[in-house]
Amino acid sequence: CSHSKAHATMNPTYPTHKVKGWIDKAIEGDKNYYELKFTLDDNPYVPDEYKQRIRDSLSGVFYKRNYLGLWCLAEGAIFDFFDKKIHVLRKPPAAAEYYIAAIDYGASNPFACVLIGVSTGQYTQEGKKLWVEREYYWDPQVTQRGKTNSEFAKDIVEFLEPYNVRSLYIDPSAAAFKREMQRVGITTIDANNEVLDGIQMTVSEMQQGNLYVLEGCKNLIKEIETYVWDKKKAEKGDDEPVKKNDHAVDALRYAIATHKVSVYKPYKHQEIADEWRRNKYDHYRK
C-alpha cells in the first residue's frame, strides 16, 4: 500500500545495522524516511538525579549508545575505567552477610571459580557491596597437568567449605561437571550466559562503586585489565569480547548477571511507597 507507515524506536547499536541505513536515508533528504533523535537530557520530566545515576552506571560503548545515542562500534578495553587504586582492595569493604560463587569450567583451558562476598547494606546503611574475595584458578598450560572432574569437584568443595555460600553458578554447558558436583553433594545453578547483557551489568556494578576485587585475585585482575572487544567481529555487527584470557572474568560475569541482591532499605512504609513510585521504571536504581 502506498500509504503504509511504520514507526519504530530503538537505542543505537553498531553502525552497520539495517535501521541505521534507513536513518542515513532520512539524513540525506529521502522524504520516505524521517528521523527524530532524543536523548535522556531532552526529557524535561526526568530528574537530574536519575540522569546522573544512569551516567554513573554506564561506560565505554554502553555510555555512547545508551546515553549519547551514538551508533558506534564496540572497540577497545571493556573495563576502560578500571583503576587498581579504586577497584582493588586489600580487605573487604564490609562484613559479608553471605557469599555467592561462580565457575567457568575448563578442561584444556583454564578452570576458574570466584568467591564473592555480598553485603545488602543491612549493617552498613551504605547500599549493596560485592567483592571478589578469593579465586580458584587452574591453568593446565602453566601447570602442565590437567585435572579430572572429580579432582576439580574436590578442589571446589575445599575452596568453598569455610564460607556461607548461598548460590553456586556455573556455565550451563558444563553438564558432566554439574553431575559430578551433584554427586559430591553440591547443588549448582545454571548461569545467565547472555554475554553482552552480563558484561553491561558487571561494568555497571563496578562503575557505580558496588563491585570490587581483593588484591589476592591476581588472575581476575589481569583479565579485567586485558579484556577487550573483538574489533573484527564488531565490524561485522557482532558485539563480542576477544575470547582469550577471559576465564575468571567470565565466572564473575556469570555471578553478577544471575544473582539478584535484595538491597536493604530501612524506610518507613510511606517512604517505601514514595520510593517505589519514583523508581517504578528506573532499571538503574541501586
Model-found features: residue ranges?
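Short, glycine/acidic-enriched loop or turn micro-motifs at the edges of active sites
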Residues: 107-108, 174
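Mg2+-dependent endonuclease catalytic cores in nucleic-acid-processing enzymes, primarily RNase H-like
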Residues: 125-243, 262-266, 275-286
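ASCE P-loop NTPase helicase motor core
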Residues: 1-58
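ATPase catalytic-site recognition across NTP-hydrolyzing enzymes
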Residues: 44-105
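Short beta-strand scaffold segments in enzyme catalytic cores
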Residues: 110-117, 253
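A residue-level signal for conserved active-site and pocket-lining positions in enzyme catalytic cores
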Residues: 9, 38, 67, 104, ...
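Short, hydrophobic alpha-helical segments
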Residues: 255-263
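Short loop/turn segments immediately following beta-strands, especially the blade-tip
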Residues: 117-123
